[in-house]
Regions:
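Active-site neighborhoods and metal-handling regions in enzymes and metal-associated proteins
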Residues: 1-340
């Protein structure tokens, strides 16, 4: 088995980091697992550092290459052999990314504790930044505030979105664009620490009364999010949850809205697996983490949650953010739009 993607390196090393160039799926090292041996393949400029600082308890034989020799992937294929599977395309190896992702679960107690801490820190950062933003700020400034607070905790962000006013209605992924903040602001990060992800979306409104159009869209999102959370029970089908989402949108008078954004998915070392709902065989498992990113035109909600040994828990909502309880088989306390 060849593991060249950064998220799979994070997983097999229990939080190690193969990154040099951040915005890239593959890292600067590969792990090869055979029946006899585990290998770390990297170029000499990175190999010793990764071996010393990023492998944690994983023992591997080091194979270091000079830049003018074989590529890391070619060397990995040579060691793995022609009947190998891989998380990236390399020569004749079978690409089996989703099968490899399935090995990440069930998650461990230690991974749960790391996710819980990351969720709590994320909640605190969103609350702090929300209280500090002001009308008229540029969206880049708000992004910088979020990224700075995460960086202080040694947390990186794979995604950061800041939307304001009409851009929240027009775009599902409002990258900062140099706009001044209006009354309505959407904040989103996909944060990562030790390879594990916490994807959160929160909203702020400046004023005494939230416009009905915004309030209605947000309420629909929360109700659908609560439904999805209620279905995160071991053995339930991902495809059935998608059917339920479609039904919820239709009942809310938005029958086409489900097509406009991914339905949500499993998270962890992979930032999000949003395609699980398309296969009728995929089932919810014990000890999984979830990222239900529910949108309706003008609103979005998203929290980190887990299905853990018979209980469901929202890890990114600690109670400091204004919230409301929703009933969907059980009670779910979900963040609301913060009014300032």
């Amino acid at each position: 088995m060849i593991l060249a993607r950064q998220d799979n390196f994070n997983w097999i090393t229990d939080g190690g980091n193969s990154r040099v160039i951040v915005p890239r799926d593959t890292g600067h090292a590969a792990i090869v697992v055979t029946q006899e041996q585990i290998y770390l393949i990297a170029q000499v400029m990175d190999g010793q550092r990764i071996m010393d600082e990023e492998m944690n308890a994983l023992e591997a034989e080091a194979v270091f290459l000079h830049w003018f020799e074989a590529s890391v992937l070619d060397k990995a294929y040579e060691l793995a052999g022609p009947k190998s599977v891989s998380d990236v395309q390399v020569q004749d190896a079978e690409v089996a990314l989703n099968d490899i992702y399935s090995l990440h679960y069930p998650m461990t107690d230690e991974e749960y504790q790391r996710m819980k801490r990351l969720g709590a820190i994320s909640d605190g950062i969103f609350y702090k930044v929300a209280k500090e933003i002001r009308l008229g700020m540029i969206d880049y400034e708000v992004e910088a505030m979020l990224l700075y607070e995460f960086a202080k905790e040694n947390i990186q962000c794979d995604v950061s979105l800041i939307g304001t006013d009409d851009r929240i209605f027009k775009y599902r992924h409002p990258n900062p664009s140099g706009r001044k903040l209006g009354r309505y602001v959407l904040l989103h990060t996909a944060s990562r620490q030790g390879g594990l992800h916490c994807n959160v979306t929160r909203s702020v409104y400046f004023g005494d009364k939230i416009p009905e159009e915004i309030a209605k869209a947000y309420e629909i999102c929360c109700k659908i999010e609560a439904f999805c959370m209620s279905q995160c029970k071991t053995g339930n089908k991902w495809s059935d949850i998608l059917k339920g989402q479609k039904r919820c949108y239709t009942e809310a008078g938005m029958p086409e809205e489900w097509k406009c954004h991914y339905p949500g998915g499993r998270t962890g070392y992979c930032v999000s697996q949003s395609d699980l709902s398309l296969d009728t065989h995929n089932e919810i498992q014990n000890r999984e983490a979830y990222d239900w990113y529910i949108t309706a035109t003008g609103a979005k909600v998203e929290e980190l949650s887990v299905n853990w040994d018979g209980r469901f828990e929202v890890l990114s909502h600690t109670g400091i953010w204004p919230s409301k309880k929703y009933i969907a088989e059980e009670v779910f306390d979900l963040p609301q739009i913060m009014q300032l």
